[in-house]
Amino acid sequence: MTSATLAGRRALVTGGSRGIGAGIVRRLAADGAAVAFTYGASAAEADKLVAELTADGAKAVAIQADSADPVQVANAVEQTVSALGGLDVLVNNAGTAYLAPIDEFPQEEFDRVVAINIGGVYSAIRAAVSHLGEGSRIINIGSINADRVPTGGTAVYAMTKGAVASLTRGLARELGPRGITVNNVQPGPIATDMNPDEGEFANAVRQTTALGRYGHTSDIAAVVSFLAGPESGYVTGANWNVDGGFTA
């Protein structure tokens, strides 16, 4: 562990077995939190991450759940509470994308993108909120596409992330009197296995960022860790663009 700023905190990260989610799980665990995370299909990836964190002395639990299914999401929350003894931090990271022009967008793909990117966030918060006490944190992982849509075919994805930003603001008002903060982290171009930082497209993206580079999962995880910790207690209802100046 690198620090103990989150010692005693119990966190659930949806979609935490790979990419940005795995980066968040690693950072929260390194900062002292006990962490549960959900995964979709790859039990091998999830088990490997649990083994890695456990070897480092962290408490980690992997839970299989389809974020498009409200029942599975609710069950994941209950399993987290049972395994960790409670819940203080919910990070809604699970998401999906399907890119196509609107007149070529399959209805079944539209339904699934909405079910995961909006429904999954709603379902997790609805199930978790009764377990969250004063000082708890809800952190949504949105996208800078909620504010800027630079290419065609991304309208549906951007719509879902815009909905998450609106939900964040509304719930910040609703849950503020209970001492629960709600914030939205909006990543820009982040290098992952699904979003490589090499190739012609990546070179074009780099030219649109103020810093001239892709971000790393650790860049997102650092902001999430701050929002999960004690020093962010007066921060709520905010959209945090972590994008290297992509939206500047």
Positions of predicted regions on the chain:
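Conserved glycine-rich cofactor-binding loop
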Residues: S17-R18
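The beta1-alpha1 cofactor-binding region of Rossmann-like NAD(H)/NADP(H)-dependent oxidoreductases
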Residues: A43-A44, Q64-A76, Q107, S218-D219
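Substrate-binding pocket helix/loop in short-chain dehydrogenase/reductase
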Residues: P101-I102, P106-V114, V205
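Active-site helix of classical SDR
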Residues: I125, T160, T168
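Alpha-helical segment proximal to the catalytic Tyr-Lys
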Residues: S130, R173-P177, G233
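Residue(s) in the substrate-gating loop at a strand-loop-helix junction
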Residues: S143
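A conserved structural motif in NAD(P)-dependent oxidoreductases
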Residues: A210-I220, E231
